Amino acid sequence: MASQGTKRSYEQMETGGDRQNANEIRASVGRMVGGIGRFYIQMCTELKLSDNEGRLIQNSITIERMVLSAFDERRNKYLEEHPSTGRDPKKTGGPIYRRRDGKWVRELVLYDKEEIRRIWRQANNGEDATAGLTHLMIWHSNLNDATYQRTRALVRTGMDPRMCSLMQGSTLPRRSGAAGAAVKGVGTMVMELIRMIKRGVNDRNFWRGENGRRTRIAYERMCNILKGKFQTAAQRAMMDQVRESRNPGNAEIEDLIFLARSALILRGAVAHKSCLPACVYGLAVASGYDFEREGYSLVGIDPFRLLQNSQVFSLIRPNENPAHKSQLVWMACHSAAFEDLRVSSFIRGTRVLPRGQLSTRGVQIASNENMETMNSSTLELRSKYWAIRTRSGGNTNQQRASAGQVSVQPTFSVQRNLPFERATIMAAFTGNTEGRTSDMRTEIIRMMENSRPEDVSFQGRGVFELSDEKATNPIVPSFDMSNEGSYFFGDNAEEFDS
């Protein structure tokens, strides 16, 4: 990991700031979420939502999507140049749910994008506040990560569905900037690069001309982002090879897939942030909380605190379990889709189940679903402890990489060993160590073989009582090793259809 001096913290990325001290970061992150909260309150007024309707997570998501759509310049330009029948490129909207005569009814609203942009800027001191938009994108991405498995997308790019723990942020839009890049998993970056290389193989002009030069710059930038996520010299050296290739093709795809597999044990450094739905920030602002003055952090106690006293509702389908719906949203709020379930369970204070055992579908309701049978229920988003979010893959103190269970990318900086089935992973590495990356491949395989499942990661790091805001008394939990730790283990979650 590079020393902190050369890297902006991800709150700085998040707020587009230069190097700032801790208080300035807390203030600028506070300003960002405060702006989201003010915007949400204003939208509730525009839409004439009651208090309860404003606390409905489905309404929050619709409002968030409207503002993201209003600021999506590339798509707006495309829509204006390719008008489709029945769609006004200058308008945006979605389903808003209201309580009428003891039932929830769906109403489709439409607004001018210009009007939404005006309300957003007004809530953010007249600025575009791109950081706040990215924050909403990351919340949607975390929700997707907890809800869907990306098996199909993995198979399409020639990767193994068992690599799903590397897919954090796979549904983030391209325009999500540095903060978005920080939360993307190794598998997500590999997949983006493979798609790019495949286009280059199929389309002769992809790398040529003025456009091709821009494409090449984007390719090298993505390679550097991925390289920065790896924590061992051999993995980074292989990324240099991929980046410097004159004409990227199958050899590079092979190398990238090899690197993705290696990341199951030699894990990459991927940032985690607790991004909450807009209505949560709205509730806090409405109750008089001044985020900018108080300061806020996405990786400390603040989001836990906020969720302790926020009441958020969700629509529930007839055969869904409200407790399971709550777990899904809790995991999304803390970006914990790929965390070890033992750690999540300890922090939440209730058992966190694997995805396949949850009786719940996604949070959003499709337009053809019957509203007559919909109920609503309060989401239980509180926790027993809090823990610092990590941006490292959790390696031991020596630069020898520690082991990672297939399907874990730690979210919380909490001491644990990372059990994994080495045989399963190593089986994927038979043979192919020839070619220009042979020495690096051999070195990576050697490191993987030497990593022991019983190695402890995040030594001495623990969870904290919710009263311990300065994180002075770490409680180091002991875990029952017999429990399966991965969320998408042996799973049947729905696919995410992009």
UniProtKB/Swiss-Prot annotation:
Region: Disordered, residue numbers: 1-22
Signal peptide (UniProt feature, chain positions): none
Motif (Unconventional nuclear localization signal): 1-18
Motif residue range(s): Bipartite nuclear localization signal: 198-216
Entry GO MF terms: RNA binding; structural molecule activity
Keyword Ribonucleoprotein applies: yes
Keyword entries, A-Z: Capsid protein, Helical capsid protein, Host nucleus, Host-virus interaction, Ribonucleoprotein, RNA-binding, Viral nucleoprotein, Viral penetration into host nucleus, Virion, Virus entry into host cell
Entry comment on modification after translation: Late in virus-infected cells, may be cleaved from a 56-kDa protein to a 53-kDa protein by a cellular caspase. This cleavage might be a marker for the onset of apoptosis in infected cells or have a specific function in virus host interaction.
Keyword RNA-binding listed: yes
Pfam families hit by this protein: Flu_NP (PF00506)
Subcellular location: Virion; Host nucleus
Cited InterPro entries: Flu_NP
GO biological-process terms attached to the record: symbiont entry into host cell; viral penetration into host nucleus
Gene Ontology cellular-component terms listed: helical viral capsid; host cell; host cell nucleus; ribonucleoprotein complex; viral nucleocapsid
Predominant cellular place of this UniProt entry's protein: virion
Assembly and interaction partners: Homomultimerizes to form the nucleocapsid. May bind host exportin-1/XPO1. Binds to viral genomic RNA. Protein-RNA contacts are mediated by a combination of electrostatic interactions between positively charged residues and the phosphate backbone and planar interactions between aromatic side chains and bases.
Protein's job: Encapsidates the negative strand viral RNA, protecting it from nucleases. The encapsidated genomic RNA is termed the ribonucleoprotein (RNP) and serves as template for transcription and replication. The RNP needs to be localized in the host nucleus to start an infectious cycle, but is too large to diffuse through the nuclear pore complex. NP comprises at least 2 nuclear localization signals that are responsible for the active RNP import into the nucleus through cellular importin alpha/beta pathway.
The family this protein is said to belong to: Belongs to the influenza viruses nucleoprotein family.
Name of the protein in its database record: Nucleoprotein
Name of the coding gene: NP
